[in-house]
Amino acid sequence: MQQNIIKVIVGSKNPVKVNAAANAMTLLFPEYQIQTIGMDAPSGVPAQPMTDSDTRQGAINRVNYCQQHAEADYYFAMEGGVDHFEFGPATFAYIAIAHQQRLSIGRGALLPLPRQVYQALEAGEELGHVMDRLFNTVNIKQKGGAIGLLTHGHATRESNYTQALILAMAPFLNPEIYL
């Protein structure tokens, strides 16, 4: 018996993002074979988005680019960013999912950031580089991320993306009530 295939284009070749997409879709559609393909998709925002709106726009820009340059069943984009909220600085990710001319936007959990980390970001550094320097790691953004380091591995960048993707899929899982 041949298994049906769901093709997902991910707006990044970062293995954390591609794996999160595969994990989310495998959990949601266990009866299907999930084919995830990473694509270099420009965000159109700074390399380190420093606002909620830039982060959201980066995810939307990536998913739009993927739709224009590849054929798939679903298009996923994840954009990590930071902002300074009333309770302090935090990092988070926006999720954009496109399917059949519909778009769903979601956001991952907020991770409070140490003030010294946020100050380095304000000075123009990227979060992954700051965390690598602070924790003496190499390319942490393609591994557990700041989330993994600051939670001692109890959560990771990938687990946060996986959960956020599953939540952002709700309109596609229940199209009859998301009109």
Curated annotation (Swiss-Prot):
InterPro entries: ITPase-like_fam, Non_canon_purine_NTPase, NTPase/PRRC1, YjjX_NTPase. The keyword Cell inner membrane does not apply. Gene3D superfamilies: 3.90.950.10. Keywords: Hydrolase, Magnesium, Manganese, Metal-binding, Nucleotide metabolism, Nucleotide-binding. SUPFAM superfamilies: ITPase-like (SSF52972). It comes from the Bacteria. Substrate binds at residues 71-72. The keyword Metal-binding applies. Mg(2+) binds at residue 71. Its cofactor is Mg(2+); Mn(2+). It catalyses: XTP + H2O = XDP + phosphate + H(+); ITP + H2O = IDP + phosphate + H(+). HAMAP family: Non_canon_purine_NTPase_YjjX. Belongs to the YjjX NTPase family. This is Inosine/xanthosine triphosphatase. It comes from Shewanella oneidensis (strain ATCC 700550 / JCM 31522 / CIP 106686 / LMG 19005 / NCIMB 14063 / MR-1).
